[in-house]
Curated annotation (Swiss-Prot):
The active site is at K11, D135. Its EC number is 2.7.1.148. Coiled coil: none annotated. It catalyses: 4-CDP-2-C-methyl-D-erythritol + ATP = 4-CDP-2-C-methyl-D-erythritol 2-phosphate + ADP + H(+). Signal peptide: none annotated. Catalyzes the phosphorylation of the position 2 hydroxy group of 4-diphosphocytidyl-2C-methyl-D-erythritol. The lineage of its organism: Bacteria, Pseudomonadati, Chlorobiota, Chlorobiia, Chlorobiales. PANTHER family: 4-DIPHOSPHOCYTIDYL-2-C-METHYL-D-ERYTHRITOL KINASE, CHLOROPLASTIC (PTHR43527:SF2). The keyword Kinase applies. ATP binds at P93, F94, G95, A96, G97, L98, G99, G100, G101, S102, S103. The gene is ispE. It comes from the Bacteria. This is 4-diphosphocytidyl-2-C-methyl-D-erythritol kinase.
Amino acid sequence: MHPLLVKSFAKINLGLLITAKRQDGYHTLETIFAPINWYDTIEFSDSEKISMSCSNSDLPVDDNNLCIKAARSLQQFAAVRKGIAMKLQKQVPFGAGLGGGSSDAATVLRVLNELWKVNASPAELHALAVKLGADVPYFLSMKGLAYATGIGDELDDLALTLPYYIVTVFPEEHIATVWAYKNFYSRFDRELPDLKKLLSELCLSGKKEGLPAFENDFEPAVFDHFPAVRKVKLTLLEAGSIFSSLSGSGSAVFGLFEREDEALAAMKLLPEAYRKNLTPPGFCMAQ
């Protein structure tokens, strides 16, 4: 086969409400996943064994890497002995709350299901994806906005598009998801907003009154421990963002802007060392 190059897009969380802690230690949540035009690329080539290389030397390329785990899980599921060589060009920051590793794993499952002619059903691929990580099912089966519950693996595809420019900023702080879950300030007894209804009003009618309800429960603890991350949010709001929030467990922060010129101006106000991305209105991963 000729080498195959595939994009793996990242996401932000528009609201992330942690609703309970299960007996197995996992937390349930409600969130809206929104895709952004920030992506890694993976090149797939023929090989007798499963292997990978990565442009970022800080990431492992052994069995601890999610791409390798995804390939091996499909190999075991299908009882095939085929291999693959993967070259990961890492652009999405890791430890940022943008789901870069989960997206890469989903890409591997989807591509190898075709290349190896496994023909696993969507339900079978979903089951493999959940074992790799809570965000992996979103990247496997969704292209645009999605409402997620459970541990993030129960998904409702929303026939909506976000009519705003999204500025996403990585302030060069890596925050482990395990740390975030250990340190967030729990509020399990509150009344929860209807995120789907509020999002529909925002996307279809432009009603912004519900935006404050899209809280991220990791944000208070992250901001207390990482003041540079808090400063990014304040800068985006001062620059005209109609809403700004931490994404996932951080440290990436995003802002919604009504005008492209405001979004571009906001990006220039942030330190040059911070990695930044601009996503246009209505973006979906099928583009």
